[in-house]
């Protein structure tokens, strides 16, 4: 089993990084079988930099020592000044159990603070118990819906970050 010390997490900068991010998001969509057309996911995949790119957003990819993409996460501005939304946290099934989710969430929060955000929102499904527990371990609390999501059993969460 890989050790976290053999894992690197970096911002998407190169074309290969972007291709890997898109591939991971496509795997995420296939695994969970959700219809996210209401989120314009096709446009998002066609040009992720438009939604998640600098200067106000960021995409991160976790890799092993061989450069294989293992997971991803992104953030973009959402809902007013100082607020961002975490999206597309995904770890490949064969890489689960390595605490990659913890590492990715920690990194995206740190990057978001550097970008000047003071709060972060996200939505997940109540059936994804490991994800809900992970978010709560970072201080996320359930909150009122911040947009309309037609998928049943959605949990909306918010984190007030240190300034």
Swiss-Prot record:
EC number(s) given by UniProt: 2.3.1.-
Compartments it resides in: Cytoplasm; Nucleus
Gene3D superfamilies named among the record's database cross-references: 3.40.630.30
Keywords: Acyltransferase, Cytoplasm, Nucleus, Transferase
Pfam families: Acetyltransf_1
Disulphide bond pairs: none
Coiled-coil regions listed: none
Limits of the N-acetyltransferase domain: 7-162
GO cellular component, one term: cytosol
The family this protein is said to belong to: Belongs to the acetyltransferase family.
UniProt-recorded name of the protein: Uncharacterized N-acetyltransferase C1271.07c
Species this protein is from: Schizosaccharomyces pombe (strain 972 / ATCC 24843)
Upper lineage: Eukaryota, Fungi, Dikarya, Ascomycota, Taphrinomycotina
